[in-house]
Structure formats: structure tokens, C-alpha cells
Amino acid sequence: MKVIKGLMAGLFFLLLCACGGQQIKDPLNYEVEPFTFQNQDGKNVSLESLKGEVWLADFIFTNCETICPPMTAHMTELQKKLKAENIDVRIVSFSVDPENDKPKQLKKFAANYPLSFDNWDFLTGYSQSDIEAFALKSFKAIVKKPEGEDQVIHQSSFYLVGPNGKVLKDYNGVENTPYDDIIADVKTASTLK
């Protein structure tokens, strides 16, 4: 009888360990560099202010003629789905055209979507070279504004950033956006320290 009780206790312990050890599968672990930028209301948002929070990021610009509208529509849908499940997550959209995307312009752009600013910041307040370097170093994302052009080349991914400021995953933000996978990963990331 003691052997059975011992086996049951051991099995129970293993089950508890397995349930508490959720991990992000194949995390990217890119370190986001410290930043302090302005949001659509002219308020500062920094990596420090996001510390301890799970957040989603993308790169957009308001004059975009191709991928930014569907990306913003998909992020809006994701925001709605996360809210419906009472999942607390911040969303950060970095402008890749800071010369043209001042806070007022970002707010006007966002008004085209049924989104909430409660947990979503559209950021600007840096130079073109700064955002190009920041995107590459922090997200391994290409951002490039060709000379004399009004369109900017940039990644179309959504990025999941953990509470430790590391990029954990990236997802397609334009087509077949994997909402369920993102939501599951956000839930898992919320348990990480």
C-alpha cells in the first residue's frame, strides 16, 4: 500500500510540474533595445514602461499603400479577440516613416479602424535612421526608405514580446494571421518571468 501511495504522490508531483512549465515553442529571444518614443497623444512610451508586460509589436506607416492597412485591420481584430478573452496585452505599432508620421497623423490613421487606444500605442519621435537600426537590432526586421520615395520597405510581421523585453515569436500580419496561435502564445508568455 505504501508503494502505491508513493507512486500516486510521485505521479501527482510530475503532473503539477508539467502543468506549470509551459514554454513558448522555439522562442526567438531577440533582446529589444531600450527606447523612449512618443505615442499618438504625444506621451512617452519606453521599454522600461513596458517592463513586466506582454506586448505585441508591428511596423507600419500612415501613407502606406500596400500592407499596412491589412496589418492594422488584423491587429485590430486580434485586439478584439484578446479583449473578449480578458487577456491583458499591450500593442505597440512603430512608425517606419517618422518624418511624416507625427502623433496627430498617427491618431488620424488609427481612427480609420475600430480599435481602442486603451492598450495600443502608435509610436514616432525618432529619425529614419534610428527606426531602421532599432528594427534591425531589436526585431531582426528590415526597414528601409528609398531615397526620394514616399513608400517604406518594411517587414509585415507581428512580434510577441515577453515581460522580460525579449522578442519571443513572429507571425504573419498580412495573410492568414494565426489569431489562435498568437492568443495561446500570449497566454503562455504571461506566465513567464
Go through each PLM region and give its residues.
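Bacterial N-terminal signal peptides that target proteins for export
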Residues: 1-8
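C-terminal motif of bacterial Sec signal peptides marking the signal peptidase cleavage site
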Residues: 14-18
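N-terminal "domain-start" segment that seeds a small globular fold
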Residues: 21-48, 73
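Short loop/turn microsegments at loop-to-beta-strand junctions
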Residues: 32-33, 54-55, 155-157
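Short active-site neighborhood of thiol/selenol oxidoreductases, capturing the structured segment around
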Residues: 46-69, 75, 92
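Structural microenvironment flanking redox-active thiols in thiol-disulfide oxidoreductases
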Residues: 73-134
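Structural micro-motif
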Residues: 120, 132, 139-144, 153-159
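Thiol-/selenol-based redox modules, centered on thioredoxin-like
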Residues: 146-193
